[in-house]
Design a protein with these regions (language model features):
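Conserved alpha/beta-domain cores
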Residues: 1-197, 203-205
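Paired acidic/hydrophobic, glycine-rich loop segments that form the ligand-binding mouth/hinge
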Residues: 48, 210-211
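Expand to "…catalyze enediolate/carbanion chemistry for C-C bond making/breaking, isomerization
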Residues: 183, 201-204, 211, 216-223
Length: 224
C-alpha cells in the first residue's frame, strides 16, 4: 500500500463514522496530476483547487477521469467563466456580482453549479468571507433566484491556533448560521469546515465536508 493510499484510508476511517456522512475534498493545489491519479486509484474522486489556471489545466488534462472539482480559492471577476466551466462546487462565494457572473457563464449542458457562501468565522482580516448574518441571508436569497446556481450551505476557516475551545466556538458559529438560514426558510445541508489540522474538531461541530491537502499529498509541490 502506498503512503498516499494509507493516508487516505486513515482519514476516511476518521470521518466515516456511523450515522455521519462527511465528504473528503482532497486539496490538490500545486500538486502534480500524477498525485491526483494516484489518489483516484485509491478511491478518491473529489479534489479542491485554489487557482483558476491550475484548475482549468488539470480539468482539461484529466477530463477522462471521474473527478468532481471543488474551487476553494478567492474568486476573481475576470476568471469566473473558467470556474463556471470546470468546477462542480464553489466554496468561496461572497459577492452578488460573482454569483450573477457564475450563473450567466455556467454552460447550458451542465447541471447547476453547487455553491457555498464563505463566512469569516475567525475574525481575521487575512481570511475572506462575510461577517454578519444579515449579509449572509441577503446573498443566500440572491443565489436562490439564480437558476444555474444551487446553494448548498456555508464554508468557513477557523483560526490557526492550538486552542480547541476557540476553534470549536468558531465552527459552532458557522453551524448556527446554517441553522438560522434554515429557520428562515432555506433548505441547506452542507458545512464545509475543517482542514488537515482541525478536521476532527470540525466533524464534532457538524461539518459535512472537510478540505485536506498536506495530510494526503504531503507538503506542496510547485511543478509537474
Amino acid at each position: 500500500m502506498s503512503k498516499l493510499q494509507d493516508s487516505l484510508n486513515s482519514i476516511k476511517y476518521d470521518i466515516n463514522k456511523p450515522l455521519k456522512k462527511v465528504l473528503l475534498v482532497a486539496v490538490s493545489k500545486t500538486h502534480p496530476e500524477s498525485a491526483i491519479l494516484a489518489a483516484i486509484d485509491a478511491g478518491q474522486f473529489d479534489f479542491g483547487e485554489n487557482y483558476v489556471q491550475e484548475l482549468s489545466r488539470k480539468a482539461e488534462n484529466l477530463a477522462n477521469h471521474p473527478i468532481c472539482w471543488h474551487f476553494i480559492g478567492t474568486i476573481q471577476s475576470n476568471k469566473t467563466s473558467q470556474i463556471a466551466k470546470y468546477a462542480s462546487w464553489v466554496h468561496t462565494l461572497t459577492k452578488e456580482q460573482h454569483a450573477k457572473r457564475l450563473n450567466d457563464q455556467r454552460p447550458t449542458n451542465l447541471s447547476p453549479l453547487n455553491v457555498l457562501i464563505e463566512v469569516n468565522i475567525s475574525g481575521e482580516e487575512s481570511k475572506g468571507g462575510l461577517t454578519n448574518y444579515k449579509d449572509i441571508n441577503t446573498l443566500a436569497t440572491i443565489i436562490n433566484s439564480l437558476p444555474n446556481l444551487s446553494l448548498k450551505g456555508l464554508m468557513g476557516m477557523a483560526s490557526n491556533t492550538m486552542d480547541e475551545i476557540v476553534i470549536k466556538n468558531q465552527f459552532n458559529l458557522l453551524s448556527s448560521y446554517l441553522e438560522q438560514l434554515n429557520n428562515d426558510g432555506f433548505n441547506l445541508t452542507e458545512l464545509s469546515m475543517g482542514m488537515s489540522n482541525d478536521y476532527k474538531l470540525a466533524i464534532e461541530c457538524g461539518s459535512t465536508m472537510v478540505r485536506i491537502g498536506s495530510k494526503i499529498f504531503g507538503e506542496r509541490s510547485y511543478g509537474d
